[in-house]
């Protein structure tokens, strides 16, 4: 049941909707972990001082 001062959505009214909410939460967690990993790799590649002199035109960013 929705309340007047409620900030989020109301509770699921059916088991299918409840499972859909769990699926959504699980999917967002996976997307967040993948995005964090990619951002960490990009930051590590940009901030490292060990660069290959034969890599031209910022090809290291295309590896990611």
UniProtKB/Swiss-Prot annotation:
Its cofactor is Cu cation. One of its GO terms (cellular component) is respiratory chain complex IV. InterPro entries: Cyt_c_oxidase_su2_TM_dom (IPR011759), Cyt_c_oxidase_su2_TM_sf (IPR036257). Residues 1-14 are mitochondrial intermembrane. It holds the Pfam family COX2_TM. It is a multi-pass membrane protein. Binds a dinuclear copper A center per subunit. Residues 46-64 are mitochondrial matrix. GO terms for biological process: electron transport chain. Keywords: Copper, Electron transport, Membrane, Mitochondrion, Mitochondrion inner membrane, Respiratory chain, Translocase, Transmembrane, Transmembrane helix, Transport. The chain crosses the membrane at residues 15-45. One of its GO terms (molecular function) is cytochrome-c oxidase activity. It is an enzyme of class 7 (translocase). It catalyses: 4 Fe(II)-[cytochrome c] + O2 + 8 H(+)(in) = 4 Fe(III)-[cytochrome c] + 2 H2O + 4 H(+)(out). It comes from the Eukaryota. Its EC number is 7.1.1.9. Component of the cytochrome c oxidase (complex IV, CIV), a multisubunit enzyme composed of 14 subunits. The complex is composed of a catalytic core of 3 subunits MT-CO1, MT-CO2 and MT-CO3, encoded in the mitochondrial DNA, and 11 supernumerary subunits COX4I, COX5A, COX5B, COX6A, COX6B, COX6C, COX7A, COX7B, COX7C, COX8 and NDUFA4, which are encoded in the nuclear genome. Belongs to the cytochrome c oxidase subunit 2 family. This is Cytochrome c oxidase subunit 2. The lineage of its organism: Eukaryota, Metazoa, Chordata, Craniata, Vertebrata. The gene is mt-co2.
């Amino acid at each position: 049941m929705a309340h007047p001062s409620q900030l989020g959505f109301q509770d699921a009214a059916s088991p299918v909707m409840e499972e859909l909410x769990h699926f959504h939460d699980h999917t967002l967690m996976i997307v967040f972990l993948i995005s964090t990993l990619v951002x960490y790799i990009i930051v590590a590649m940009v901030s490292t001082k060990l660069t290959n002199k034969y890599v031209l035109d910022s090809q290291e960013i295309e590896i990611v």
